[in-house]
A protein has these predicted regions:
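Acidic, polar-rich low-complexity tracts and alpha-helical solenoid repeat scaffolds
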Residues: 1-137
Length: 137
């Protein structure tokens, strides 16, 4: 991909310009899909802490991805599930992370079909946070 871009930079008026741009577009699509599948795999295998980090990295690298909505939703879901599995002394912080992820999801995708499900995770996270805060006292 870098070589194709270098070629286009060196020869901007080449007759191969459209072909090179098409190849670059296809390669970027493959890289995006590979990054998505890798991040999604952590979630599928119930490695929620790793899933959250990998999905957030995916969102940083590919903010306009066709997978962006699903990735942001899975960040929320993985943070919630990670908080659920955590020890009581760590739950407060992790539920707070899930709540923050809900607000990010709702702000970025206010028309999402998954917004109702996200709201359920938000409610459960708030309940979990309140419970964890009470237990810490």
């Amino acid at each position: 991909m870098d070589e194709l871009q270098l070629f286009l930079d060196r020869y901007p008026s080449t007759i191969l310009k459209d072909s090179c741009n098409s190849m670059i577009f296809q390669l970027r699509g493959k890289l995006e899909t590979k990054a998505w599948k890798g991040a999604e795999l952590y979630f599928t295998t119930s490695k929620y802490q790793s899933a959250s980090k990998a999905l957030q990295q995916f969102m940083n690298d590919w903010p306009t991805s066709r997978y962006a909505e699903e990735a942001q939703f899975l960040v929320l879901k993985s943070q919630f599930l990670y908080a659920e599995q955590s020890t009581s002394r760590r739950q407060e912080e992790r539920y707070a992370d899930a709540i923050e992820s809900y607000f990010t999801f709702a702000a970025r995708f206010p028309e999402s079909a998954r917004l109702n499900e996200a709201e359920q995770f938000h409610r459960k996270s708030r309940t979990g946070l309140e419970k964890a805060s009470t237990e810490q006292r």
